Amino acid sequence: MRRNNKRYFTFPALYGMMERVKNINAQNKDDTMDHRTEILPGVYLTAVQSDKFKTGCFSLNFLRPMCKEEAAANALLPSILLRGSKDHPDIASISARLDELYGASIGTLIRKKGEVQLTGFYCDYVQDEYVEEPVFAPVMEFLAELLFAPRLENGAFPEAVFESEKQNLRNAMLSRINDKRSYANAQLIRAMCQGQSFGIPRIGEIEDLEHLTAKSLYAHYQALLETSRVELFYMGSLAPEKVAAVLRKTLSRLPRAKEFTPVGTTPNPAPRPVQERSETLDVTQGKLSLGFFTDITANDARYPALVLAATVFGGGATSKLFLNVREQMSLCYYASA
């Protein structure tokens, strides 16, 4: 609607816009198909079949509750597993094996979604039809080797590898303050969600990292394999049934408990008093971060409308914040939502 020759968007109007976009997309379906199934106890595969790309993508995610006691351990674990296995004990041999797989790549994943921490790996590789031999299955076998047969010394991760990766994670934690924009947003979340899981940083806290040892991390690794729900994501040209068959075979060594650690996000619908926090640093540009609670989670039917509302408000160079606060009023260097 319009007021004083300016356009204002209400939440119902944005929801209606989102529904119209969904209808348009439904009318223009292409050859992309997605499929989700439980291939092993507590292991779920989402496969998106498409022949549009020459490179296939895959990710393996262990889902853990976002808690202070294990956030740092979950963040440290993938990088240590990627440092060596029984048959490929160092970075050089791992790189050589990936070169043999037509330049495939394997990297670590540490993400936070709501009150859930995801830790694992992602892979990129050439699609099978572009080479003379299968690539997806051997890449998955190599990933399983790194995951299930890590290099060990005296019943624990090698001390030198552990200390090296622990220092890398420590440096990452200490360097968070160097990016003042993301640091301000992180401090906002920490203040808003004090005492809640969502307030914990994605890679954990440095004091919890310092308590870890090579032996305690290996014990955590064993428990993580057994008790975590696992989400697998595949994008490529193979049929979902073939992908599932390959993964059932390569992940057959995954130990499974009778019950898995529950994960989820609790909405925060109750009103809260307004909080204000400030921090003084030696900077030339101040940062102002504003946070608002809603009761909408990613599974809510209203979530796409909320995302669209944030985009209209501050999602780019045509947003209300950018055009008004930055361009017209010249009050800041950047403004976004």
Predicted regions: what they are:
Residues 141-152, 250-258:
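A common structural junction motif
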Residues 46-48, 54-74, 91-145, 181-207, ...:
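M16 family metallopeptidases and their MPP-like homologs
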Residues 2-3, 21:
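N-terminal, intrinsically disordered charge-dense segments
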Residues 10, 18-101, 205, 218-324:
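His/Glu-rich zincin catalytic helix
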Residues 211-218:
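Active-site glycine-rich loop that binds ribose-phosphate moieties when present
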Residues 84-88, 128-132, 149-158:
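Short, polar/flexible loop-turn hinges at active-site or ligand-entry regions and domain interfaces
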